[in-house]
């Protein structure tokens, strides 16, 4: 996240209406939403590195897990951008989603049920108590790189449509 830094014209930037985890991308000439009180600016992650998905190559890649050497350099600035450092992967039951989720439910199982569309299991897993914004930290920290917020939004829309 750029803060107290001059915006360089040569750098390609992404403007986000709202915060980094739950905001929407807007154009540079866009506007701040009615319910938002901040505009986030990140460097665009168009610079793909050879074997960028290997965690030990670059120690400037931010990670909340000790899969890269970036945790050794806590005081040094990290290079935050929009690059995913890999592509979407399969769900792996490591417990990382449960560690960062703010509620006491099973987020991975709920996401899977939203993908399947099983309303009864979605209700048992607590779909009525969540909103897509609750899954923002999962989108950032999950090694599966699955868009959990989008899946939950589609699950809630499906639930609303089927119960009407």
Which ranges hold each PLM region?
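Redox cofactor-anchoring modules in respiratory/redox and cofactor-processing assemblies
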Residues: 1-164
């Amino acid at each position: 996240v750029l803060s107290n830094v001059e915006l360089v014209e040569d750098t390609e930037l992404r403007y986000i209406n709202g915060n980094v985890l739950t905001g929407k991308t807007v154009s540079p000439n866009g506007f701040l939403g009615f319910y938002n009180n901040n505009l986030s600016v990140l460097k665009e992650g168009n610079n793909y590195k050879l074997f960028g998905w290997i965690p030990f190559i670059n120690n400037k890649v931010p990670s909340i897990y000790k899969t890269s050497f970036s945790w050794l350099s806590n005081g040094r600035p990290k290079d935050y951008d929009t690059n995913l450092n890999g592509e979407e992967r399969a769900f792996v039951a490591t417990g990382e989603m449960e560690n960062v989720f703010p509620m006491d439910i099973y987020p991975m199982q709920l996401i899977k049920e939203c993908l399947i569309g099983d309303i009864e299991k979605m209700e048992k897993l607590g779909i009525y108590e969540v909103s897509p914004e609750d899954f923002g930290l999962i989108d950032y920290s999950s090694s599966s790189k699955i868009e959990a917020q989008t899946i939950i939004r589609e699950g809630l829309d499906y639930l609303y449509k089927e119960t009407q």
